[in-house]
Amino acid sequence: MKKKVSVITVNYNNLKGLKRTISSVLSQSFSDFEYIIVDGGSSDGSKEYIESKREYINQWVSEKDHGVYNAMNKAIRMAQGEYCIFMNSGDHFFSSQSLENAAKMLNGSDYYVGETIIIDSKLASLCLPPQNMSFRFIRDKVLQHQSTFTRTQLLKEHPYNENLKIVSDWAHFLENWYFKKCSYQAINTIVAVYYTDGISFTNGDLLKKERKEVFSELFGSTSKLPHIKETAEEKKERINDDFAFKLKKALKM
């Protein structure tokens, strides 16, 4: 019987983070999911650890790949759940009820995005998805893939661009939401905890470069990006989101 969710973990030589992620996934109160791990041929004991947990893992592979999005696409081809969520090594669900709370809201849209705790070396912040997606938001910000549920069939039909190193998930959403009118819905619950030592967070210059390349490919040039005036509703939502973000930072939550 088809599962509701495919939880996917991609890993390469991050045994410490992998243990944290697997522990979080296996502690979930929700049971209607499959667990897939794609390891890039690690040499730090990751493969052996995955093998020790194989009775709890539906599918896994450890072999050389061509980058994170190649590994993610490999997992997508294996996935049989209705929705995919990528909880890559090091990141984890917020609580043991996170998947159960989010799954209640998965009901037909192409993308569902929940709230994310972002942790750096000094403090924690809460990242909130917009209640109403706008081009302004996706132009200027990102969606945390650790808290994003994407319809599996959409991912199979339109896999991630493996030529991009760190923004392919963002580009996937931009193209499918803006041009193909795929549906989006915010989930008002904290789904995941994300640590800022990931490649996309620590490579600001590459992120800007790749985003510019995506804009040029989709719109012809960055000068042709839509100039959309911020609505009163968007402004109110942005102010509320910014306030909540700053409050959490001030409280170090």
Task: Cite the ranges covered by each PLM segment.
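Short aromatic/hydrophobic "clamp" motif used to bind/position activated sugar donors
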Residues: C84
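N-proximal low-complexity "stem/linker" segments adjacent to membrane-targeting elements
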Residues: M1-S27
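Conserved donor NDP-sugar-binding/catalytic core segment of glycosyltransferases
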Residues: H92, S96-L126
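Cell-envelope/extracellular polymer assembly enzymes that use nucleotide-activated donors
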Residues: K3-S6, E34, A171
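Glycine-rich, basic loop-to-helix element that forms the pyrophosphate-binding segment
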Residues: T21, S46, S62-A79
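Conserved nucleotide-sugar donor-binding catalytic segment
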Residues: L126-V214
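Acidic helix N-cap motif at the loop->helix transition within catalytic regions
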Residues: K16-K19, D44-S52
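A conserved acidic beta->alpha catalytic loop
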Residues: S31, D39-E48, N88, H92
